[in-house]
Amino acid sequence: MRTPRFRVQAKNVFLTYPNCSIPKEHLLSFIQTLSLPSNPKFIKICRELHQNGEPHLHALIQFEGKITITNNRLFDCVHPSCSTNFHPNIQGAKSSSDVKSYLDKDGDTVEWGQFQIDGRSARGGQQSANDAYAKALNSGSKSEALNVIRELVPKDFVLQFHNLNSNLDRIFQEPPAPYVSPFPCSSFDQVPDELEEWVADNVRDSAARPWRPNSIVIEGDSRTGKTIWARSLGPHNYLCGHLDLSPKVFNNDAWYNVIDDVDPHYLKHFKEFMGSQRDWQSNTKYGKPVQIKGGIPTIFLCNPGPTSSYKEFLDEEKQEALKAWALKNAIFITLTEPLYSGSNQSQSQTIQEASHPA
């Protein structure tokens, strides 16, 4: 009887080298140097130990186009140390996603190129999608989760990308990086007693903080050290020029807020901030409402003038009721001198110019 001629036609090829001690990095280099009918787009090598301790190597190769293999010795590889020849089993891979998942299960892998999504899975069905999303949630980061969904559930990746992107932002939300003050608090050696007392009473962690702490409005000329001092007191949210309450900027676990150079005429959530109110929502222009835990004081920083000063704003005739409320929820201080002495002036001014001129 005539022996069937060896022939494999496929765009994706799966190789298995049984009882193979070749380093996986060497096999990857070997495949990259082969003269093949089509250029590889992606190669992944996996080293797997069977129960008897013998190593096997598996390889997935994705090509630009379908290839025909008639030489069953095409992928034979010689061990770099002992000249032993290793011959693989060669077969077409119906689902690259399933093969890649199999290679990834033990984690001892090396790869080259960009994995090509094929959208075919032998498992299929709802359970496969559930498994893919479970793997995405366990991936540890938004970018890794998106890669998992792109590979395993490409239809959802294309059709639901906007929702996925938004949901994963919230799931893998990272608090803003903590601010590091360029000066220790001791650099500010001309802080009025009233300011020091306010800090001692209101800028505390959640366990020691009053239930409804008082806020403070600090008005003064530029380069008096207001911003640097206010930001040196502890973990805080810094909102300058406009309010951004997105999780990327605003941290619900901060001890206090600093609102710097925001015209009080256009300050959204005036009472929520000044009154240290708890559990309130902010509607965003292009997203879902943001839930603010609140209950922390706010330092309002401003310069004199009709579009900056909170005092001038509250002295307007139409703000009479708001002024009466504000005086019960905040103290107002006007600085006439810098918060630092002459010995600290040069360094403080340099940092102030680099950060914010208020």
From Swiss-Prot:
Its cofactor is Mg(2+); Mn(2+). Residues 7-115 form the CRESS-DNA virus Rep endonuclease domain. One of its GO terms (cellular component) is host cell nucleus. ATP binds at residues 220-227. The keyword Chaperone does not apply. GO terms for molecular function: ATP binding; DNA binding; endodeoxyribonuclease activity, producing 5'-phosphomonoesters; helicase activity; metal ion binding; nucleotidyltransferase activity; structural molecule activity. A motif (RCR-3) lies at residues 102-105. Its EC number is 2.7.7.-, 3.1.21.-. Divalent metal cations, possibly Mg(2+) or Mn(2+). It is found in: Host nucleus. InterPro entries: CRESS_DNA_REP, Gemini_AL1_CLV, Gemini_AL1_REP, Gemini_AL1_REP_central. A motif (RCR-1) lies at residues 14-17. Residues 155-175 are annotated as: Oligomerization. GO terms for biological process: DNA replication. Residues 142-152 are annotated as: Binding to RBR1. The active site is at residue 102. Homooligomer. Interacts with the replication enhancer protein (REn). Interacts with host retinoblastoma-related protein 1 (RBR1), and may thereby induce the transcription of host replicative enzymes even if the cell is not dividing anymore. Interacts with host PCNA. Interacts with host SCE1 protein. There are 3 rolling circle replication (RCR) motifs. RCR-2 is probably involved in metal coordination. RCR-3 is required for phosphodiester bond cleavage for initiation of RCR. This is Replication-associated protein.
